Amino acid sequence: MILSICPPHAALDVAREVAGFNGIYLDANAISPMRAQEIAEFQQRYVDGGIVGGPPDEPGTTRLYLSGDETSEAAALFAGSNLEPVVVPDASALKMTYAAWSKGTAAMLLALRDVARHFGVERELAAEWARSMTYLPERLAGAERSVAAKGWRWAGEMDEIADTFAAAGEPDGFHRAAAEVFRT
């Protein structure tokens, strides 16, 4: 089995590099369902995957969503590990819709902070959040920490999410903008 976990922009190139591999190719990248279909064309035994959660340091914290014809064999390799395999109809679609919220809202908070800073009301916004939406100051702090380390990768993920929204006939502008927030 080849397990591909790389930044979204490299997923197709990695699949091309190993085209013709006869084993299971498990793509667990943050890619759109359309990109997953494109990658499947290069692999005979393709499994679409999507990871939700942080590093699997302990059981129950990280899921590996799987879809495709070879999911049983792929799931068996992770059974009993800290990475919980879960078979779903479309792993990439689930990953995209989950990350649209979890990482998309991080981009929104960062942009809101920057707009408030621009207009000189950052402190006042933080004070209002502390009063009326008590979870947001810590969520913003978490977004600031995460984007410093992972923003470059999340930008590509937002592009993939935007493509997913467009394919579903939904507006894609928010996540295209979120990609720009992560690029700056």
Could you say what each language-model-derived stretch is?
Residues 1-34:
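Rossmann-like NAD(P)-binding element
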Residues 7-17, 80-86, 128-131:
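Short, composition-biased local secondary-structure segments
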Residues 94-184:
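Helical "substrate-binding/catalytic lid" subdomain
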